[in-house]
Amino acid sequence: MAPQLLAWFETSGRKDLPWQRDPTPFRVWVSEIMLQQTQVATVVPYFEAFMRRFPDVRSLATAKLDEVLHLWSGLGYYARARNLLRAAQAVVARHGGEFPATLGEVMALPGIGRSTAAAILALSRDERHAILDGNVKRVLSRWFGVEGYPGEPAVERRLWMLAEACTPHARIAEYTQAIMDLGATVCSRARPACLLCPVNAGCVARAGNLQDRLPAPRPRAVRPRRQAWLVVAMRGGHKVLLERRPPSGLWGGMWGLPECPTRAHAEQWCREYLSGAHPPRAGEPLKHAFSHFDYDMRPLFVRCLGKAEALRDEERYRWYDVRQPARVGLPKPIATLVARAGEEMDDD
């Protein structure tokens, strides 16, 4: 497989992505984290903005979480950003600011698993390490005819063995990028372009017309749905009250809106924690799909004069100026609700 892939990569592979122009371990690492569950076209502007602010691991290690989350806002999966900051701090503390030398040391950093660690070392240092991201799992499952869901331990072990066997002993960085590109651009999840595939001659899935069956999908489960009422407290000066979320869990460490289980609880919260509150009104619901559940957000807009003394902790509660926004991490749905509040205040 490797010779055909490398020949294809020379003419059809992606070679001018921002992190490829200067593939240092730090730049490749940041790109690999951003690319998890996210398309390349979406990542490029985020990566470039991130590099302008944090050109190296030391500048990232000294950053405040709010600024990192601000630059990540809109990418989703915010645990990636928190782990990236923690890992940068670990690189400086444990390795003197130099990216670790071994696969095991890289895997010991927060948020970096085996495949990501292997990709960083392969792409930045041309070291021989097999990778197994989602694209590679799909390519190998189809080419070798591997049955079963790739997330099952036995299937994953089989795929790791195949990934190791296919990885060549030279031109590692090119091969690694080539097999990822093949999965992303040719051997896609739906409607793979088999006629354009450089390794289609030996593909079990193509020979048996099994492209739609391989790899096997995740076993279906009932998708949970959650609902919450979010208090959108507005005061003069185009200010909206934000609450910092707990460090872990949904949108961990980011700034959100006070959340209540029911409208009655939200109205009670307004009476207890806002001063001079006007009668609240319910806004248009906002729905957001996470990877593992659907979230229905029901905003309760309320005008007030200020917040109660119980909310004086500025590290947890702050007034956010819609016209001059602070550089803090706002999840996209929260930013949408804050923007709605700004429009409502503009109409006054």
Model-derived regions: residue spans:
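Catalytic cores of DNA base-excision repair glycosylases
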Residues: P3-D212, R225, L274, T336
